Structures are given as C-alpha cells and as structure tokens.
Regions:
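Conserved ATP-binding/catalytic motifs of P-loop helicase motor domains
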Residues: 1-329
Length: 329
C-alpha cells in the first residue's frame, strides 16, 4: 500500500469506533487476519500487540451455518502460509482468542411454529430424528408442481449456471446477447473467463449476458443503496430500449420490491413512462473497474494493474448459490 493510499484510508477511518462483520460463518480465518493486518497498516499500529488496530470488532452470526468457500473457519488456523506463520508466532494470544462470546438464546425468526423451529435447530447440529423428517416431508413438493419462477438453490456455481440457462431456453421470444466491452493497459493480458459462472475473472459480470423479455434477473452491483438498487435485488425484464446503432442501451426491469428504483424512474421518465404499468425501472450498462492478475509467483498474485469493463450489472435469477442467499437473508 502506497503512502498516499494509506493516508487516504487513514483519513476515511479516522472516526471508526466499531466494525461489525455479519454472517461470521462465511468469514474465513485468512480473511479475519487480513482485516486485522490491514487495519494495523492503515492506522499505523503494531499488528503483534494491537488486535484490529484497537478498533472494536463485533462478529455476528451462527458458526453452525455455511462455512467459508475454500477456506478454514474463522476460529481455525489460517490456510495461507504467510498468514499461518504470523498466526503461529502469536502463541496462545491469537486474534480469535480476543473475542468474547455473547449467545442469544431465543429464536424469533420462526414465530409461533415451534415444530418447524425445533426441526431447523436439529438440522443445524446435524441431527435428524423421525419428528424432524416428518416435518420436512410436509414441505416436499414435486418439481412439476413448482411455479417456474421458484428460486432453486445449488451448492456449486456450475449447477446455478446450468439451471439458469435451461430456464432461459424454455422462455419464448428473441434471445438478446450483450458482449462486455473490456479494456486493459497496453501489454496486459485480457482476463480469463470463469468456466463455471461464465463471468470475467475477479468480477461477477458476465462476459456475454444473454436474456429475453420475461427473464428473471438479479442485480450484481450496488447501484444506489438509497434507491434500493442493491446487489441481490431481483426482478423481471419487461422491456428493452435500443440505441441508434440497434444495440441494447438499457433493459427495463419490474423489480420484486416496488421501492426499488423509484429515483431511477424519476430520473429517466422517457423510459419509465413507457413501462409505467409495470413500474418499470431502466437499468443501463455499468462501467466497472477490477483487478487484473498480472504477476504470479507460485500461487501468489499481485494486482499491479486494473482493467475496466462495460456490461449490464445483471445475471439470470432462476437459481442461486446457497452462499449468496445466506448473505441476503
């Protein structure tokens, strides 16, 4: 981190008193130590004696839920060799040992449904009694009886992509394909495409975004949190507007939440007015800056350059990963 970048970050964090990290089960040990080390670097504190640069940290969540992707749980040894070396040097005074647990004993999420709550609590700790199985069987529905728009959850990204593609093929109408416009510094290799998610490396943006009118989609970028246009907002495409060159300029989305995009609709009345009956919100292609993996030594990458892309901040939303949905809940 350059002195200029560190100084700017220090100014931003000058009044930080409490850092809250939600969904702690998804936070890996490596990430926890990276947060600690980065805070110490920015605030110029001793990483061996000042946990999180003496900033109060609150971890919120349930460690019995989904574990980190490709990582060790937050209370375990880090996976990265460099971080593990630092971890071992702390002896018994690990970062995790500094936390004090506070346990909430009453579950209010399931309301008055005690049977359902008891079943979920058993599953949480890996138990399945006959009564739990009986409760779960009351929730089983054959796939042919499901609403076609019912969201499917999968563990692997490839299964998510396959189901989304299958549902798009079943949808009548013209298939529209929009290729991302990618620019990188001269002499830098263009980014790879993730074979499972079909996204541009280090991003959630599709290399080619394919859709039809009527397709279910989800925002993958926080466009405007004050307008409820957040990463994870779902809806249905109800229209497409083209530029003079007959390229898709924006898509019109009927979001599931009526509050999504109210400011955006007011900003672009020429588009939203034509789709007023759908409460349609125009969504344009977004310019996104991302890290490029430019140098590698062993398994370590150094993000020495940045690329830019122009693409719709959307993906199909007939299916999602369990990890993504846990973060949304």
């Amino acid at each position: 981190m350059s002195d200029k970048t560190r100084a700017a970050a220090k100014h931003t964090l000058a009044n930080l008193k409490l850092l809250i990290i939600d969904e702690m089960s998804l936070v890996g040990a490596d990430m926890l130590y990276r947060i600690h080390k980065r805070l110490c670097t920015i605030l110029e504190m001793n990483e061996n004696t000042d946990p999180f640069a003496n900033i109060n940290v609150m971890l919120v969540g349930d460690l019995m839920q989904i574990p980190p992707v490709m990582g060790h749980q937050v209370f375990s040894e880090p996976k990265d060799k460099e971080i593990l070396s630092f971890y071992n040097g702390l002896g018994d005074q690990t970062i995790w040992s500094k936390f004090q647990p506070m346990i909430l004993k009453h579950n209010h999420r399931q309301g008055e449904s005690k049977g359902w709550a008891d079943a979920l609590n058993e599953i949480r700790v890996g138990i399945s009694t006959q009564s739990t199985e009986a409760v779960l069987r009351t929730r089983v529905t054959k796939e042919e009886h499901l609403d076609e728009k019912a969201l499917h959850l999968f563990y692997f990204n490839k299964d998510v992509t396959d189901h989304n593609d299958k549902m798009l093929k079943k949808l009548p109408g013209e298939l529209i394909s929009v290729k991302a416009v990618i620019s990188v510094p001269r002499g830098t290799k263009t980014p790879d495409i993730d074979p499972g998610k079909k996204t541009i490396a280090n991003t959630e943006f599709k290399d080619v975004f394919e859709f039809k009118i009527g397709a279910r989609v989800m925002m993958i970028h926080n466009k405007d949190l004050t307008d409820d246009l957040f990463n994870g907002a779902g809806g249905t495409i109800v229209g497409i507007e083209y530029s003079d060159k007959q390229q898709a300029k924006c898509v019109i989305i009927q979001f599931d939440l009526p509050t999504c995009g109210a400011k955006q609709r007011a900003k672009y009345p020429n588009y939203s007015g034509r789709y007023k009956r759908f409460n349609g919100t125009p969504v344009f292609r977004h310019e996104h800056e991302f890290n490029l993996k430019t140098k590698s030594y062993g398994k370590k990458y150094f993000h020495a350059a940045k690329g830019k892309l122009l693409q719709f901040p959307l993906r199909l939303y007939y299916a999602s990963s369990a990890h993504k949905i846990q973060v949304k809940l």
